[in-house]
């Protein structure tokens, strides 16, 4: 609901109120973003300047309260007395946009530039600000748990209007905050980092041409004292996949200015008369339930309003991907054999990754060509796809459409299609980007990718992009608009094709891609211990239904770390489960484990993918329909470990719950030569007997079963003891380094949830 009363605008849902007002001077003053309020409460949140501060520049010399520098504002200009960072820069010209009018629109106001946006909004508020030669439209759309903001600048004059900066929003919040960002790099994405916001500006930005693995566009502002389950937290994100910028800075008056939008480094757009520039949509959320409360608001928004309609709430298949198992070394016979093994293990989708086209026997050639390599696939893609589907599997295929190798037929025919500049080429992973600003390039991709999807009846696409861009400023923005055009033209007519976006892993995990791609490959790092940080970081802003999460071989290619097969699955369950290893090397004991893993995941798939996600003291939990699944994850063990508790949140305290830990295999070989202390024969730790036993047999590992009240589980129950170096028993948890548990908690009171 959006209300306007005596100059006060009020966006209100069951979860929040957002209020601002038009001042006597036509500026927009922010009042409140938080708990639902009455419109009549608005005056209580007004920043009253009194006689003002010294050194103020005022809009009206007769009004000492007309200084903008000490106000909480919704938008600000340049050279009018507000010396904080401005969201708008007009190439060195002053900006003084004042309120003119408003409209309340039903639903979402469509964007006109080709940018994606959130769908199915309730109402939209349009605010018009003007100055001579320029008009600014501010759009606010109310969603149940979030609101979105964006801006459109229009040249209403007779000459050129230079634009060098235009943010999606600017907002001043009272109070002190910590800015929480999610940073990293290739195979080390989205690690949480907390930075106090003070007088020095804190910036979160990307300049790689993509939203980047270095700095995810989503970030939080946490009020002092906030934790996972209590305290005030604001969340912000951008529906955009290119260079982004966000900043936060606290003023002398205790106001924290936050803004976000396209990164305008090296940006200049000269708007002709009547021409407009439209910013991406920014997303804002508030919670007084700590970080988990904020995550819940963002998760619901993404699942309900960002993900393509066809895939909202739809279960994602358990997939097998050929990359880590085969890389470029495969042929049709090997792929069909892997498909036989995959379907036997319980997989539902077979994905052929890189290496199927042109002379693609390594990563130095072939990108840009779409002719199937008949030496590897003599029956073509249709023939392979038919064989895969005949086994009861769906068939998926990897593409990297945005890139081209200089050693490719496409580049030899159209070198001008590559994104280059006046200097010698600089390559990334031996490749250039195609210039998606050019219509002929976009047409080529739409025709070739779309044709192959239709001919081979492909059910799933992994869309990769493996290098950073050289495009600067406005050119980088136009490249992203070209990408969105290609994605829209390929996938809008084929909504049933499941698109998984990838960019060297998590280099483009953002809301813009999620408007087309229901899930994203989180990282090229499949080590589950690294994934605890990567997926854990993503979970603050993105739901687990968007996480591509695979079980891979041990030791892990990215870390050389050895981890239990159970832990690899236990981490991957909290996302869209897949397997990515050479299946022919699985031991008999591992085959049994994987079959049990896929069966367990399918049984609880809806809970894992769409349940309410919470970060806990010991790991993660998801809850849906009276079922909670709690993961307990260990890193390095210590000698003589103490007692461990499991606390479960979000239960009905009076109800009874059955609690069962997931049975997990304990490899015999984990004990090595220690077995000689418990078996009647002297076991050679390097001998054939132990190797055979380790391949075929496993031990029980501390299954715990009980029935308890919700209050008990919320208080924290004692788990079975961990291994303490005093021997093995079936009723202890022998986990070792990087071990983990899954607990299944089910409500025993039908109809109470």
PLM features: residue spans?
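Conserved, mostly hydrophobic/aromatic
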Residues: 15, 151, 274, 320, ...
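Short Pro-Gly-centered flexible turn/kink motifs
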Residues: 94-102, 269-288, 737-746
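Active-site neighborhood of glycoside hydrolase catalytic domains
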Residues: 373-380, 412-566, 570-591
């Amino acid at each position: 609901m959006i209300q306007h009363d005596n100059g006060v605008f009020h966006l209100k849902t069951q979860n929040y109120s957002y209020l601002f007002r038009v001042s006597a001077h036509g500026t927009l003053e922010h009042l409140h973003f938080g708990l639902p309020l009455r419109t009549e409460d608005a005056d209580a949140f007004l920043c009253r300047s009194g006689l003002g501060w010294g050194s103020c520049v005022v809009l009206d010399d007769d009004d000492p309260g007309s200084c903008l520098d000490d106000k909480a504002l919704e938008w600000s200009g340049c050279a009018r007395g507000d010396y904080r960072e401005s969201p708008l820069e007009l190439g060195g010209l002053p900006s003084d946009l004042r309120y003119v009018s408003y409209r309340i629109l039903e639903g979402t106001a469509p964007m006109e530039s080709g940018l994606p946006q959130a769908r199915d909004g309730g109402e939209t508020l349009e605010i018009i600000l003007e100055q001579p030669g320029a008009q600014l439209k501010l759009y606010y759309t109310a969603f149940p748990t979030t609101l979105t903001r964006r801006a459109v600048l229009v040249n209403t004059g007779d000459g050129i209007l230079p634009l060098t900066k235009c943010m999606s929003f600017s907002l001043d919040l009272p109070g002190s905050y910590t800015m929480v960002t999610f940073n990293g790099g290739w195979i080390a994405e989205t690690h949480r980092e907390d930075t106090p916001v003070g007088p020095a500006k804190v910036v979160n930005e990307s300049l790689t041409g993509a939203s980047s693995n270095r700095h995810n566009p989503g970030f939080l502002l946490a009020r002092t004292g906030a934790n996972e389950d209590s305290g005030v937290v604001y969340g912000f994100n951008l529906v955009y996949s290119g260079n982004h910028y966000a900043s936060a800075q606290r003023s002398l008056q205790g106001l924290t200015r936050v803004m976000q939008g396209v990164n305008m480094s090296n940006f200049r757009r000269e708007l002709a008369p009547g021409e407009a520039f439209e910013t991406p949509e920014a997303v804002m959320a508030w919670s007084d339930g700590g970080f988990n409360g904020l995550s819940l608001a963002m998760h619901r928004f993404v699942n309900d309003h960002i993900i393509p309609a066809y895939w909202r709430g739809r279960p994602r298949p358990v997939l097998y991907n050929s990359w880590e198992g085969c890389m470029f070394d495969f042929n049709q016979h090997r792929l069909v054999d892997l498909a036989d093994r995959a379907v036997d293990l319980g997989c539902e989708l077979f994905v052929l990754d890189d290496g199927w086209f042109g002379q693609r026997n390594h990563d130095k050639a072939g990108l840009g060509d779409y002719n199937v390599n008949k030496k590897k696939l003599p029956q073509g893609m249709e023939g392979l796809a038919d064989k895969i589907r005949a086994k009861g599997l769906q068939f998926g295929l990897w593409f990297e459409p945005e890139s081209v190798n200089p050693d490719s037929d496409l580049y030899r025919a159209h070198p001008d299609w590559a994104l280059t500049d006046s200097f010698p080429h600089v390559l990334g992973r031996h490749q250039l980007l195609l210039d998606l600003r050019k219509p002929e390039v976009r047409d080529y991709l739409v025709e070739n990718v779309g044709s192959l999807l239709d001919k081979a009846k492909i059910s799933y696409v992994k869309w990769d992009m493996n290098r950073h861009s050289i495009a600067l400023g406005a050119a980088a923005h136009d490249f992203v608009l070209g990408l969105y055009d290609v994605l829209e033209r390929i996938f809008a007519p084929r909504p049933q094709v499941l698109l998984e976006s990838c960019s060297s892993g998590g280099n483009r995990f953002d809301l813009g891609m999620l408007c087309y791609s229901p899930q994203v490959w989180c990282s090229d790092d499949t080590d589950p211990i690294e994934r605890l940080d990567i997926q854990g970081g993503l979970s603050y802003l993105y739901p687990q239904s968007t996480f591509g999460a695979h079980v891979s071989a041990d030791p892990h290619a990215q870390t050389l770390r050895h981890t239990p097969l159970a832990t690899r699955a236990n981490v991957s369950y909290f996302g869209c489960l897949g397997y990515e290893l050479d299946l022919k090397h699985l031991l008999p004991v591992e085959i049994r484990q994987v079959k049990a893993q896929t069966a367990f995941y399918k049984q609880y798939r809806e809970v894992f993918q769409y349940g309410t996600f919470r970060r806990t003291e010991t790991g993660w939990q998801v809850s849906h329909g009276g079922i909670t699944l709690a993961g307990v994850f260990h890193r390095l063990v210590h000698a003589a470990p103490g007692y461990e508790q499991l606390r479960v949140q979000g239960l009905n305290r009076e109800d009874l719950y059955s609690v069962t830990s997931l049975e997990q295999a304990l490899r015999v070989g984990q004990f090595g030569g220690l077995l000689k202390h418990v078996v009647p024969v002297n076991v050679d730790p390097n001998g054939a007997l132990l190797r055979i036993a380790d391949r075929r047999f496993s031990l029980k590992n501390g299954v715990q079963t009980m029935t308890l009240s919700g209050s008990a589980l919320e208080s924290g129950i004692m788990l079975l003891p961990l291994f303490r170096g005093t021997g093995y028993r079936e009723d202890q948890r022998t986990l070792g380094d990087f071990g983990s548990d899954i607990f299944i908690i089910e409500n025993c009171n039908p109809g109470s949830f």
